[in-house]
UniProtKB/Swiss-Prot annotation:
Name of the featured protein: Protein hedgehog
Organism in which the protein naturally occurs: Drosophila hydei (Fruit fly)
Residues involved in Ca(2+) 1 binding: E155, E156, D161, T191, E192
Region (Disordered): 26-56
InterPro entries for the chain: Hedgehog, Hedgehog_Hint, Hedgehog_sig/DD-Pept_Zn-bd_sf, Hedgehog_Signaling, Hedgehog_signalling_dom, Hint_dom_C, Hint_dom_N, Hint_dom_sf
Length: 481
């Protein structure tokens, strides 16, 4: 519709609205109950048309004052207003639902490996652990991959190409998703996975289910350089564009200390400050305890523990230790978020524990009860038994007097806090249920308070779901890999 037509419609609409408004006001009574002078003059001069005017007035009053009439006029004006706007084309999210790339991806070149290290280096896929046969005790640790988006060649006819380690399956499924987004209609093809016939070299991770040889279902060799790059982005620990006919990828062992616990936790011996003023070990915390936390402004507040993201008192893990100049010591897993104060910018950020550096500032509770910056003097690592990850309503917790996040793996505190909003809502709804509250009161009288926490052993189901989804929706730079 051109501008002249729109202007004409606007003029008609304005005239109609003004006419209806004038007629509506002309028949409204004055505050003293008298009719307006215009109506009196009209009645004196046109007595014969009184009946017609009254009927018309009632009709106008009905149109002007009923909700149906008001809605009709509003819709008419909105329609005319919409016609005055020109349509615009917006950019869509691209093919599929995959995460957007932050940078351009460059294909690998023939014979290139990422990282440029030996495959058995600790920073790559790590050392060999020994071949696995069907009758080996470790064979039960391998898994089958039935992903329908992956084409398995299976030359042997035994299904061996579907057998692999858990980490290898995770990365392979992620790569299959990326391949479908990169080339619609093309699937990832696995030509070799676990090898029980020892058809490779003496030292091969194929024998452990930690390596795969891949290609594309259309056998288009021009895609293989980009396929190798996608494998790197998917998280394979070592990728080699070894041949023009295929790509070789391998991963760390599932029992590798560097990946044995990818979530964020504290040690059970670490303590939190209760609202009563008493200190309590994290291994003894219970849902409903109110512990010292930190609000969005960096001020100390007490917040309720609503669940445990993870809790396993027997698992042995590697931890990072932060020592401050005030004597505080925080022991936490490398992927956990720690609050770091930047005095130059006067801002508070959250970074992964293994990326905190000496001379950084962390917030520590002082003798007055306030959270004050203290310098990190020394960093170390320690191996300890047990992991505990309480989640408070604030999303933060002060452990061993050091302010830390309740979240890990994801670099954004606000995004992680938003992701746990359903659990906070569920906790609130449960607190409003009298029956549940009465049941909890009855249980508190008959059982120790920490029985609630002891019922959980392992990763919380909702946290586990978020950890699995993150690889598909978040950029790699946002994750602790």
């Amino acid at each position: 519709m051109d501008n002249q037509a729109v202007s004409a419609l606007w003029s008609c609409a304005s005239a109609t609205c003004l006419s209806l408004d004038a007629k509506r006001h002309s028949i409204e009574p004055n505050p003293d109950g008298q009719a307006s002078p215009d109506v009196n003059n009209n009645n004196n001069n046109h007595n014969k048309s009184t009946t017609t005017v009254d009927a018309h007035s009632r009709k106008l009053r009905h149109i002007a004052h009923t909700p149906r009439g008001s809605c009709f006029m509003a819709l008419l004006l909105l329609l005319l207003l919409a016609l005055n706007f020109r349509h615009a084309h917006s950019c869509g999210p691209g093919r599929g639902l995959g995460r957007r790339r932050e940078r351009n991806l460059f294909p690998l070149v023939l014979k290139q490996t990422v990282p440029n290290l030996s495959e058995y280096h600790n920073s790559a896929s790590g050392p060999l652990e020994g071949a696995i046969q069907r009758d080996s005790p470790k064979f039960k640790n391998l898994v089958l991959n039935y992903n329908r988006d992956i084409e398995f060649r299976d030359e042997e006819g035994t299904g061996a190409d579907r057998v692999m380690s858990k980490r290898c399956r995770e990365k392979l499924n992620m790569l299959a998703y990326s391949v479908m987004n990169e080339w619609p209609g093309v699937r990832l093809r696995v030509t070799e996975s676990w090898d029980e016939d020892r058809q490779h070299g003496q030292e091969s991770l194929h024998y452990e289910g930690r390596a795969v040889t891949i290609a594309t279902s259309d056998h288009d060799q021009s895609k293989y350089g980009m396929l190798a790059r996608l494998a790197v982005e998917a998280g394979f620990d070592w990728v080699s564009y070894v041949s023009r006919r295929h790509i070789y990828c391998s991963v760390k062992s599932d029992s590798s200390p560097s990946i044995s616990h990818m979530h964020g936790c504290f040690t059970p011996e670490s303590t939190a400050l209760l609202e009563s003023g008493a200190e309590k070990a994290l291994g003894e915390l219970a849902i409903g305890d109110r512990v010292l936390s930190m609000d969005v402004k960096g001020q100390p507040v007490y917040s309720e523990v609503i669940l445990f993201m993870d809790r396993n008192l027997e698992q042995v893990e590697n931890f990072v230790q932060l020592h401050t100049d005030g004597g505080a010591v925080l022991t936490v897993t490398p992927a956990h978020l720690i609050s770091v104060w930047q005095p130059e910018r006067q801002t508070l950020n959250f970074i992964f524990a293994d990326r905190v550096e000496e001379l950084d500032y962390v917030l520590v509770r002082d003798a007055t009860g306030e959270l004050q910056p203290q310098r990190v003097l020394r960093l170390g690592s320690v191996q300890s038994r047990g992991v505990v990850a309480p989640l408070t309503r604030e999303g933060t917790i002060v452990v061993n007097s050091v302010a830390a996040s309740c979240y890990a793996v994801i670099s954004s505190q606000s995004l992680a806090h938003w992701g746990l909003a359903p659990m906070r809502l569920l906790s609130t709804l449960q607190s409003w249920m009298p029956a549940k509250g009465q049941l909890r009161t009855a249980q508190d009288k008959s059982t120790p308070k920490d029985a609630t926490a002891q019922q959980q052993n392992g990763l919380h189901w909702y946290a586990n779901a978020l950890y699995k989804v993150k690889d598909y929706v978040l950029p790699k730079s946002w994750r602790h890999d």
